[in-house]
Structures are given as structure tokens and as C-alpha cells.
Design a protein with these regions (language model features):
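Conserved residues in the N-terminal Rossmann fold of short-chain dehydrogenase/reductase
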Residues: 75
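Proteins that catalyze or organize thiol-disulfide redox chemistry
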Residues: 1-42, 47-72, 80-83, 87, ...
Length: 125
């Protein structure tokens, strides 16, 4: 049985420890998860061997923790999802693609800061 793990980030809401998940997407679940999301989704197209991808990962964890009620954070491993990589024209990693209502609304290629990402996410809400 193929189970996809998701990274759990601890979040304190109302004094209770809860979790905001960073969703792992692949070719089998991408379209459904993107189209059914009631909130915008920031998808990180990354590679495990990519230094800048590893550098932006803690930033995405922070955003998931702080903004988890208004946005979802997801990751796609480009080496394991070549059809998605081709479909969205991913040529460099990290590439961050912003979705709302199942449609691409914005994209950032390369390493960027938390403030820029939050600003872009706010334009989607």
C-alpha cells in the first residue's frame, strides 16, 4: 500500500496543540487536492538534492504554522513527478506556484523571502 506522508508542523490555536500539514502531492493526487481546496495553495516544486530548496523549506514550515487557516502549503518532488513538472513548465527548483480555485495565479522561481511569499498569498485572499 502506497501511503504519502505529510510533514506536521506544530501550531498552537486557542491554547491547544494542533497541526498544520504540508501536503505531499504527486501525479496521483495533485488535480483533486488542488481543485477541491477551499483556500489558496502554495505548491513548492522541489528536489531533495537542491540546496535552495532545503533553504526555503523552513520558511514554508513557518508560513504553514502561521497562516495554516487561510492557505495550504504543498510540495511536489520534481524527480518523482515528471508529468507535473512538464505540465507546469518547471525548469528550475525551487519553483513556487500559487493556486486559487484550481487555477495558477502566481509563480516564483528561485529562493525568495518569507515577506514576499506572504505578500503574494495576501493578494489571493
Amino acid at each position: 500500500m502506497n501511503r504519502k506522508a505529510s510533514t506536521k508542523v506544530a501550531v498552537t490555536i486557542g491554547g491547544k496543540g494542533e497541526y498544520a500539514s504540508i501536503i505531499e502531492l504527486d501525479e496521483s493526487n495533485f488535480d483533486q487536492r488542488i481543485s477541491e481546496s477551499p483556500v489558496p495553495i502554495l505548491v513548492d516544486f522541489f528536489a531533495s538534492w537542491c540546496g535552495p530548496c532545503r533553504m526555503i523549506s523552513p520558511v514554508l514550515d513557518e508560513i504553514a504554522k502561521e497562516q495554516g487557516d487561510v492557505v495550504k502549503i504543498a510540495k511536489v518532488d520534481v524527480d518523482n513527478s515528471p508529468n507535473l513538472t512538464s505540465r507546469f513548465g518547471i525548469r528550475e527548483v525551487p519553483t513556487l506556484v500559487f493556486f486559487k480555485g484550481g487555477e495558477v495565479k502566481d509563480q516564483v522561481v528561485g529562493l525568495t523571502g518569507k515577506a514576499d511569499l506572504i505578500s503574494r498569498l495576501k493578494t489571493l485572499n
